[in-house]
Each structure stands twice: as C-alpha cells, then as structure tokens.
Amino acid sequence: TLDLLANDLFGLLDGLELNQVHYIGLSMGGMIGQAAALRDASRFLSLSLCDTSSRIPLEARSAWNDRINLAQGEGMEALVPSTIDRWFSANFQAQRADEVDKVREMIRGTAVNGFCGCAAAIRDLDLTDRLSTIDLPTLLIVGEDDPGTPVSAHEVIRACIENSELVVIP
C-alpha cells in the first residue's frame, strides 16, 4: 500500500537523520509524497510532484489488475511494449530511442513481486479528497503529451492544494 511505502520513506529520512526535506517524487514517487505529506507534513519543507496522480479512476483499475496478472503469468518482459507506449509519446520514442531503451531494460530488471505490490498500490490510489489538508508549497510538473499521467490529473491536484503551482512542459 502507499501507507507502507510512506513508512519506508519516513524510515529512510530517519536513517539519514533528515528531519525536514524538500521532497521530489516522480510518478509513483509523487503518489508516495502525497501520502506521506498527508500523514506528517511537518517532515517536508516543500513538495515537487512530477508526472503523477492523486486518484486512479475506477474504470482504470481493471487495467492494473491485468498488468499484475500478466507480470505474474508471463514475467516483466510481457509488460515492456505497453508500458513504453503508456510512458512515452510516439514522438519521444522516435527522437530519443537511446533513452527509451534504458527504460526498457529497467522494466525488464524489475522484480515481479515488487512490481505487483507497487501496481496494487497504484491501482488503489485515492487521495484527492484529502489533498486540501496539505499546506506546503507544492510544485507540480508534467509533460503536455504525457500519456500516463495527463495534465488533467495535475490540474486536479492543483485545485486541491492551495499553495501549489502547475508547470506544463511543452
């Protein structure tokens, strides 16, 4: 769950003897940052949340179950094509094939159990209704063509966190 991942974050901060930090989270890291700030905002000076979301729509949850089942049945290789297409626009894939290849290798190297646990946490993500309680300077960053976490998902977070700014990268 995201609560367990937030626990891991707090454990890391404690282990590094960091009482307060400027937190930067990308994708799932942004989800973890939201969950952690909801639990103990005093640990953060600011949040920077990139290419993330605060809620997975009900209609998208079955897709996460499908990904979990595919990983368990066929391994991570089976997820590579659809993940690349979800994470990168066709234009980016064509222009930056070298970078996309690095991500393909990262996906292939991901442990199935770790993926399945994180995918279940993402599937169950539903923080939007609580975000208005976050009183931290918050920077939201998203690419305008991000197919996985669209600008609209960041606009929802922006509307909920009063002291937030949204930057859309062309």
Residue positions per predicted region:
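Residue in the alpha/beta-hydrolase core beta-strand immediately N-terminal to the catalytic nucleophile
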Residues: 22, 45-48, 132
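Short beta-strand/loop motif that positions the catalytic acidic residue
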Residues: 134, 140-142, 146
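Short, surface-exposed alpha-helical segments at coil->helix boundaries
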Residues: 3, 97-101, 151-155
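Conserved alpha/beta-hydrolase "nucleophile elbow" surrounding the catalytic nucleophile
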Residues: 21, 25-30, 143
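Conserved alpha/beta-hydrolase catalytic His-Asp/Glu region
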Residues: 58-63, 74-132
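Catalytic histidine neighborhood in serine/cysteine hydrolases
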Residues: 151-170
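Flexible "cap/lid" loop of the alpha/beta hydrolase fold
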Residues: 31-81, 87
